[in-house]
Swiss-Prot record:
Protein name per its UniProtKB record: Large ribosomal subunit protein bL12
Subunit structure comment from the entry: Homodimer. Part of the ribosomal stalk of the 50S ribosomal subunit. Forms a multimeric L10(L12)X complex, where L10 forms an elongated spine to which 2 to 4 L12 dimers bind in a sequential fashion. Binds GTP-bound translation factors.
Function text: Forms part of the ribosomal stalk which helps the ribosome interact with GTP-bound translation factors. Is thus essential for accurate translation.
Any Gene Ontology biological process: translation
One cellular component term from this protein's GO annotations in UniProt: cytosolic large ribosomal subunit
Organism of this sequence: Helicobacter pylori (strain Shi470)
Gene: rplL
Keyword entries, A-Z: Ribonucleoprotein, Ribosomal protein
Pfam family, one: Ribosomal_L12_N
């Protein structure tokens, strides 16, 4: 008996955010793909030199190392991301880990400062 596309969509719709996140990770591993959005190169070609001189406006905040004060880092990670305790703990143990994607420069620097204050090593890219 084959499962219809509608049944698959209904099942996915019933998943919690955590379960859906785990499912996405499984898809990425099984099929060797990434769920991160890709940038269209055609727009940059049309802009020419003007596009190259523009300052980057979106940044990713990456936890490179959680340091010695893991509990404090977990608390800050939970505050920043809204993750649950287990997910925040996993994020601090599996470094490097992207905590926030596509944030503005000011927010990225604020997050970096908060994490560095509790002993974490953070990269902003």
């Amino acid at each position: 008996m084959a499962i219809s596309k509608e049944e698959v969509l209904e099942y996915i719709g019933s998943l919690s955010v955590l379960e859906l996140s785990e499912l996405v990770k499984m898809f990425e591993e099984k099929f060797g793909v990434s769920a991160t959005p890709t940038v269209v190169a055609g727009a940059a070609v049309a802009g020419g030199a003007a596009a190259e001189s523009e300052e980057k406006t979106e940044f990713n905040v990456i936890l490179a190392d959680s340091g010695a004060e893991k509990i404090k880092v977990i608390k800050v990670v939970r505050e920043i991301t809204g993750l649950g305790l287990k997910e925040a703990k996993d994020a601090t143990e599996k470094t490097p880990h992207v905590l926030k994607e596509g944030v503005n420069k000011e927010e990225a620097e604020t997050i970096k400062k908060k994490l560095e204050e509790v002993g974490a090593k953070v990269e902003v890219k």
